[in-house]
């Protein structure tokens, strides 16, 4: 039988499609790309629009407020959503999560008036990744592998070494316990999973911090799936695949002008890393690490139960090459330099004139009380200050209720062109904040004072 719907379907011109996509995005700010495409098919069943064209057109659709995206400056639209596992009210009572229209995704806004210097919340990373500059300190037991606190001397009294390997050392028992899910999971401990040694050595030799983040995400999910209550693995799945902003690393790098020259080498490199990760965290029955890995899963299980094989759906979701590229892009978008991945911090969007300051403050820092506000922001860190990877979120100046909380993803002292290029290469978008618009007419994107 002839499909009359398909026969009658038309391909709308950009003049018709782009305004429709702008309205669609405005009306459904909480939906990702695929759900928006499904909604478009519901609203306009007479149209024939492929996913490839839809993605490209969405980048060129008119922006909120009447402005239009520059066709020469199309942005990558990240898949994102809300993370139901974060109890924002208890972490940051004066802050709430908001879904913005126009493909911007989620962000944070003030619920109440905030004063200069006010501490909004403090947060530890849920996935810890180390700066390459810390490697020598970590391998010499001069720094805690969990919180990055410096030791006065190697392996000081009361500190806790990993009981299974020599590659991790901790301030105390608390940091060691936290590390089992965030910085030194059993599945990546060389003493428990010998194949992890070559992977971690590769990461540190190459300074592949984003790969470290992917490895620890996979190790945490696999551990929670095997050993903990099922709810934790499901909670993490929602955070990763529905809550955090992500763009495939391949899609991101395909936008680079030199992609045609580097694509072959990059694809080969990614395939190699993917194979290494799979052999360490999901070895096939024919791989030499399969039986040792199965024994490890059994030994760490509270009841020494035999592991249940991953389903085909789980393998595709977590260990396929496409998922690896998605996770690599996710870590690149959300990773904070001082410690790794932070759940609530990852909600904040960029501005070249941010109203929020993110700091690693001394452990002696005491937040100001309400009756002492407003106050100046804390002074720079001094030599000898004991700091960690805990983030302290501060208001740079007075912030009104409903105002979005923003941070700068790049060095604010760079020129407009330098900032925008860094944001495009690192995060997939061309900044159009108020400062960038003001400086647009200034020759050479004048640098900030």
Curated annotation (Swiss-Prot):
Predominant location: nucleus
Origin: domain of life: Eukaryota
Entry's localization field: Nucleus; Chromosome; Cytoplasm
GO cellular component, one term: nucleus
Swiss-Prot/TrEMBL catalytic activity: L-lysyl-[histone] + S-adenosyl-L-methionine = N(6)-methyl-L-lysyl-[histone] + S-adenosyl-L-homocysteine + H(+)
Pfam families linked: SET
Keyword terms: Chromosome, Cytoplasm, Methyltransferase, Nucleus, S-adenosyl-L-methionine, Transferase
Top EC group: transferase
GO biological-process terms attached to the record: methylation; negative regulation of gene expression, epigenetic
GO molecular function: histone H4K20 methyltransferase activity
E.C. number(s) listed in UniProt: 2.1.1.-
PROSITE patterns per record: SET (PS50280)
Annotated SET domain residues: 93-410
Family: Belongs to the class V-like SAM-binding methyltransferase superfamily. Histone-lysine methyltransferase family. SET5 subfamily.
Cited function: Histone methyltransferase that monomethylates 'Lys-5', 'Lys-8' and 'Lys-12' of histone H4 (H4K5me1, H4K8me1 and H4K12me1, respectively), thereby controlling gene expression and remodeling chromatin structures.
Protein name: Histone-lysine N-methyltransferase SET5
């Amino acid at each position: 039988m002839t499909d009359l719907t398909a026969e009658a379907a038309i391909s709308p011109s950009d003049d018709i499609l782009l305004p429709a996509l702008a309205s669609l995005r405005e009306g459904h700010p909480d939906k990702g790309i695929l759900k928006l495409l499904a909604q478009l098919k519901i609203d306009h069943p007479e149209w024939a629009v492929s996913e490839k064209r839809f993605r490209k057109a969405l980048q060129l659709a008119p922006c909120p407020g009447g402005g239009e995206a520059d066709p020469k400056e199309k942005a990558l639209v990240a898949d994102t959503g809300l993370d139901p596992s974060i109890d924002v009210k208890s972490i940051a009572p004066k802050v709430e999560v908001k879904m913005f229209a126009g493909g911007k995704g989620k962000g944070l806004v003030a619920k109440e008036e905030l004063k200069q210097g006010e501490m909004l919340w403090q947060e530890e990373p849920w996935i810890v990744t180390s700066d390459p500059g810390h490697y020598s300190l970590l391998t010499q037991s001069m720094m805690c592998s969990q919180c990055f606190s410096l030791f006065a001397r190697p392996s000081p009294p009361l500190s806790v070494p990993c009981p299974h390997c020599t590659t991790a050392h901790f301030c105390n028992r608390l940091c060691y316990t936290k590390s089992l899910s965030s910085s030194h999971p059993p599945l990546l401990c060389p003493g428990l999973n010998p194949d992890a040694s070559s992977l971690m050595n590769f990461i540190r030799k190459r300074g592949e911090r984003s790969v470290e983040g992917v490895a620890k995400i996979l190790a945490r999910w696999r551990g929670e799936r095997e050993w903990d209550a099922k709810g934790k693995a499901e909670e993490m799945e929602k955070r990763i695949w529905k809550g955090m902003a992500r763009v495939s690393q391949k899609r991101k790098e395909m936008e680079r002008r030199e992609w045609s020259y580097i694509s072959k080498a990059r694809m080969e490199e990614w395939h190699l890393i993917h194979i290494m990760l799979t052999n360490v965290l999901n070895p096939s029955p024919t791989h030499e690490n399969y039986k040792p890995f199965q024994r490890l899963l059994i030994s760490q299980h509270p009841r020494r139960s035999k592991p249940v094989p991953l389903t085909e759906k789980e393998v595709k979701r977590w260990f396929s090459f496409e998922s690896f590229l998605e996770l690599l892009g996710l870590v690149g978008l959300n990773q904070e330099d001082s410690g790794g991945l932070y759940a609530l911090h990852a909600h904040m969007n960029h501005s070249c004139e941010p109203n929020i300051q993110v700091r690693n403050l001394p452990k002696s820092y005491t937040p100001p009380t309400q009756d002492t506000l407003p106050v100046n922001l804390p002074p720079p860190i001094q030599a000898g200050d004991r700091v960690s990877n805990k983030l302290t979120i501060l208001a740079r100046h007075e912030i009104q209720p409903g105002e979005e909380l923003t941070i700068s993803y790049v060095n604010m002292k760079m020129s407009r062109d330098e900032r925008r290029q860094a944001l495009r290469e690192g995060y997939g978008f061309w900044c159009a904040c108020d400062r960038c618009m003001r400086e647009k007419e200034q020759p050479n994107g004048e640098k900030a004072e």
